[in-house]
């Protein structure tokens, strides 16, 4: 049996099984909002959802999914009764990366992928299947967008814009997207193709709102989402659970932390840590561009761990973080393991993520929680250990002194090139 055929059968069976046992429980608060938005779309149309829905602060792509759900439901009563089936949308995107990479002929990743190790990971599925949140949608789109841009920049940009209009957090990967575009786009024609694809995608996504003169509503919703939870941490067991005495949720991030505010301090730590993480990838992409070389295995392995660390830094240092904002790192660390054969970062982050989700929703899994192991600071220490371990691996392989020296040489070579 061909590997692609085997993958299709196994993934179809896994998807069908998960659908069959799809939990009826979900986040009452989140689904309360989504039911309100679904009824607002049903009554007033999708272009008016930001004006009639209660606290609508999600981007259009997820709202289009709610609209599609509305279309499939014949009456208001069915919309209300079957709202739990909205979980199917994020579940589809949980499967999307491995379906694309394992069920079809492609050149994005040529390695053998143990896809069941991702798909049957309860930490990976919990966010979609139990909670019913939508982080898997933008996570999978960002992953596929950045990989695709290595070969087809215009298509990659289209996918990335879809990710951005699903969740604003996609912006954390924007510097990597710019670096890949700088490596891949080498002519004015290629640049124009990317620009046209970008403008066309944004226009299509916003078209219903543009037609009704409601495009500003989307922008206002994005602004509204910023500082929606102005707390030091919202159940994200990150560095602030180790630095703040008491409960970080009870502390506003506008308060002073030594000299700066908590928010400013977290943002600076994120920018510095992510900036250092980007140096090896920048050097590698510039080297490949100067040598007119195609993407290779080493680049993709470096890309995966870089993306995972950027997401981890975003979650670990910034304020206002929820526990589920680490979700994209699971995909990145899994595919880093596919290349490196080192599954330790993926396993560690899966354990920490599952513990944090289970602590947030203690009634979902039949787990007897140990008060010490499942304490907030214990989970924060596990996240810290995972980040430190992964950074040690990263900087052992890519020593900053060497990377900076080589980057300076390449920049001089690029500047001197006629």
Predicted stretch roles:
Residues 1, 172-200, 210-214, 328:
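Perimembrane helix-loop-helix junctions
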Residues 2-36, 44, 91, 120-121, ...:
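Transmembrane signal-anchor helices characteristic of membrane glycosylation enzymes that use polyprenol
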Residues 21, 98, 226-316:
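Aromatic/glycine/proline-enriched transmembrane-helix motif characteristic
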Residues 22-23, 211-215, 219-232, 262, ...:
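Transmembrane helical bundles and short interhelical boundary loops of multi-pass, membrane-embedded
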Residues 32-64, 68-77, 214-223:
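Extracytosolic helix-loop segments that constitute the early lumenal/periplasmic catalytic or substrate-binding loops
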Residues 84-111, 144, 272-287:
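Transmembrane-helix motifs of polytopic, lipid-linked glycan transferases
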Residues 100, 137-154, 332-333:
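Specific aromatic-rich, kink-prone transmembrane helix
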Residues 125-127, 144-148, 154-179, 204, ...:
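Membrane-interface alpha helices of multi-pass inner-membrane proteins
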